[in-house]
UniProtKB/Swiss-Prot annotation:
CDD domains from the UniProt entry: HATPase_MutL-MLH-PMS-like, MutL_Trans
SMART domains assigned: DNA_mis_repair (SM01340), MutL_C (SM00853)
GO molecular function: ATP binding; ATP hydrolysis activity; ATP-dependent DNA damage sensor activity; mismatched DNA binding
Protein name (Swiss-Prot/TrEMBL): DNA mismatch repair protein MutL
A biological-process GO annotation: mismatch repair
Protein source organism: Porphyromonas gingivalis (strain ATCC 33277 / DSM 20709 / CIP 103683 / JCM 12257 / NCTC 11834 / 2561)
Annotated keywords: DNA damage, DNA repair
Family stated for the protein in its record: Belongs to the DNA mismatch repair MutL/HexB family.
Amino acid sequence: MSDVIRLLPDSIANQIAAGEVIQRPASVVKELLENALDAGASIIRLDVREAGRELIRVTDNGKGMSQSDARMAFERHATSKIASFQDLFSLRTMGFRGEALASIAAVAQVELLTRRAEDELGTRLTINGSEVGEVATVTSPQGCILCVKNLFYNVPARRKFLKSNETEFRHILTEYERVALVNPQVAFSIYHSGELVQDLPPSPLKKRILDVFGKRMEKDLIPIGIKSPITNISGFVGRPDGARKRGALQYFFVNGRFMRHPYFHKAVMAAYEAIIPQGTMPNYFLYFDLEPSQIDVNIHPTKTEIKFSDEQAIFKLIGVVIREALSSSNAVPAIDFDRKELIDIPAYQGPGKNVVRPPVDLDPSYNPFKETGLTEPIRSSRRQSPDMGWNELFKQFEAKRDAEKMAEPPIRSEGLFASTDFTPSAVSATPSTDMLCYVHRGRYLVTTLSRGLALVDFHRAHKRILYDRFMADESRRHIEQQQLLFPELLEFNPSDASAVKAAVDELQSVGFDLSPLGVSSYSLLAAPVQIIDCAADVVRDVIHTTLEDGRSSHEQMLELIATQIAEYQAIPCGKTPTAEEASDLLAELFASNDSTYTPDGKLIVSIIEEADIARRFE
């Protein structure tokens, strides 16, 4: 039998390696931007076409490469960053494995134009699927221009699984922003299909954050800083009142590299505990600077997972620096005691003053135990109140209360739910007043079914009802619009402009009036009358959810808008409904096509079977 183990060709090996390093166009952008930074570039331009499918081009003014280096750069494990294993523990560069360019060249058509400052002419190199094409000497500006065309052209399965252009471009913007935020001294610009999306000049860190995410954040940023033998921490954290339910801006950077660290995120959240509303997230931009020997970045090909030698100490340090920053900036309100009712106590005058005993009236002949005859009845020591007719008033109150009880619907009956097994078809949509309904802890309704007891979360039930009403009104185009007394300014991330515009177009179709004020700013002029008081919050939540989930179709957007409107308009938890409100709510809920779950998938009704109830008393 012949041997079956063989060595794979370099082209196939590179395509396999590319599966780990190059997952989508954003992966290419990340690697090329980091290479430009490692080359010492101070100006970097990123051009993208068709969300990176057709073209990704990075132009920089870095050191450039010689012709031999340009050819060697596309070989696997070829790098200028390390020469020995010990160099891994003193890394200050972004790349070091020598895998990125080889992986990119394996799944795309690559063209490189480069020149060093000391060379008169540069080099032009083309590679198609790991196959080197033309290598020529040409005129070229200093630095590098690296073009990646037709990504995954030779791996159709990978190209087929790419998302929509909007989604892929958002991933590109995310990588671009991460690199820009940690290198404020470098000028960045990004173009999509020839149109300028964002231009970032060199600037201080705070201005770079504002340039990326909008000037609206200026009042939200609180500077932090601490130096210790373990690590130096700097950056900004958000004010508690700027915490968001969705779309919080949360970034960790270590030694100029973006990272994800769930453990450190817990430290941040612990510092904000009890000072931000439950379910919200604070903004933060934390930069760690420590010796490279104290971290290990060689864990994952994307280098976003990093291990620290003393994570527990850094965890505590994060909590200390954030709490100190919040306290010193008055972001956490201090206790202010009212001094009006304080007793005026004179200050102690010192030992030189004689202490005088205050005069006290004393009867030395008084004996509390002396027996005396009772000459008159003992009177109560309590003060006697004049007869104000309280008894008569109480009787009138009881009579009035009895009359009100007679006017109320009976609370016990076998009417509405006696013959139903929790199916909408068996329930009349007409509100019934003949039912058993009990409110538990101001949130849950307890009612009867033929199968047993139903526990209903009335806040969620109201959400389902409002959602159904909105969808029915939208289908009939009966949404009533109301003008805001004062238009409200809404600002979004400039890099999300295209996705925001798509969401705004859908909002316009369901009763919102949003007027553009620039690339990523809008003025909210009108909204559906039901949510006029919280219209701006609804718009923000809809857009942030769209950016996170990538919803784009009309049906998806409509469902999202209806869900957010129902969330804000529903009866808040803790507000007890009246008997009539509870009856109407239950009747309309069970008439719904889906009375079991809210639009976002949360349980509304839990049933305790009759058999389970009987079993408890056995």
